[in-house]
A protein has these predicted regions:
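Acidic, serine/threonine-rich low-complexity disordered tracts
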Residues: 4-5, 18-171, 207-296
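Hydrophobic, well-structured mid-protein blocks that either form specific transmembrane helices
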Residues: 162-204
Length: 296
């Protein structure tokens, strides 16, 4: 696998699932995972949006959201991350399995910048044979407020091919809050989430009543918009077991323009914890999968 491929996987992964997913959420390959997908029936909104199609020759890079979409849909009643939860994933690219491992942790709640916040963590490591050419050991820390999981502080502690990078950023929508020593300020839109907070937010959504959500995501380098739509249900078999899931199509927009060269599908279990069990990515150079291996 080329360094360029790994770099692209890392960037996309950060946008989607939590900075620490920097390599994993897109490192899923074609393993023994089995998916039996059932699409949702067309909705009235889908039909009406088709009838309102733009005239020929005209297009909009950012189509309007339908009436059921929400940038900050309320979390499902009773949903709350479980302190101490550990999710372990294995990533594959093309026909090469287990190129990387990813651990997502819920490390309780802490006070930061005067706010109560969830401390979410992710640890990513490349595995052999990829590790022989691209050694990567990254850690990501997110401090996200309960409820909508908007980010307060986002940290990247990267070790890639012998080069180490430490980044600690305090997110601000006004630019008026001074960052403490050793911390940089990142100006973002109100309600911006980091990748780890976005993953928890997608888990909190009641997909039965809110089939489409969207909002800004800051990956530690750049601001994107994420749009996630429920497209159906699926029975999914991954190393951790068999799950009934909601199938969520995820699109990434850069400055209002969809990144059409990549397509992502997230499978969220229909259990009380709304566990993310599988992420599929179709990229220009390969298909990737990140599969749940173990849940603690």
């Amino acid at each position: 696998m080329s360094r360029r491929m790994v770099a692209v996987l890392a960037v996309i992964l950060a946008v989607l699932c939590g900075a620490s997913a920097f390599v994993w959420l897109h490192a899923g390959g074609q393993s023994k995972t089995v998916v039996h997908f059932t699409p949702d029936p067309p909705t009235a909104n889908d039909a009406s949006s088709t009838s309102r199609a733009a005239p020929a020759g005209k297009s909009s890079p950012t189509p309007p959201m339908d009436s059921k979409s929400s940038a900050n849909a309320a979390p499902q009643p009773g949903f709350m991350p479980v302190t101490g939860e550990v999710l372990e994933f294995t990533a594959s690219v093309a026909k090469v399995s287990n190129v990387a491992s990813l651990r997502l942790l819920v490390n309780g709640r802490k006070q930061i910048a005067g706010k109560d916040a969830w401390h979410l963590q992710a640890f990513a490591h490349t595995q052999n044979p990829l590790r022989m050419v691209f050694e990567l050991d990254d850690q990501f820390d997110s401090y996200s407020v309960p409820g909508d999981f908007a980010s307060v502080q986002y940290e990247m502690h990267l070790s890639e091919r012998g080069q180490k990078v430490q980044s600690v950023e305090r997110l601000t929508a006004t630019g008026r809050e001074p960052a403490p020593a050793g911390v940089s300020a990142a100006r973002v839109l109100p309600g911006t989430r980091d990748p780890l907070g976005m993953m928890q937010y997608l888990r909190s959504v009641d997909w039965a009543t809110t089939p489409l959500v969207h909002g800004p995501v800051y990956d530690g380098r750049k601001l994107y918009e994420i749009r996630a739509r429920k497209t159906g249900s699926a029975e999914v078999q991954v190393p951790a077991g068999k799950f009934s899931t909601s199938t969520v199509d995820v699109k990434v927009f850069d400055n209002g323009v969809e990144m059409n060269d990549a397509h992502f599908t997230l499978y969220v279990a229909k259990d009380e914890a709304r566990t993310p069990v599988l992420l599929e990515a179709v990229l220009p150079f390969a298909a990737a999968r990140v599969e749940l291996r173990k849940k603690q």
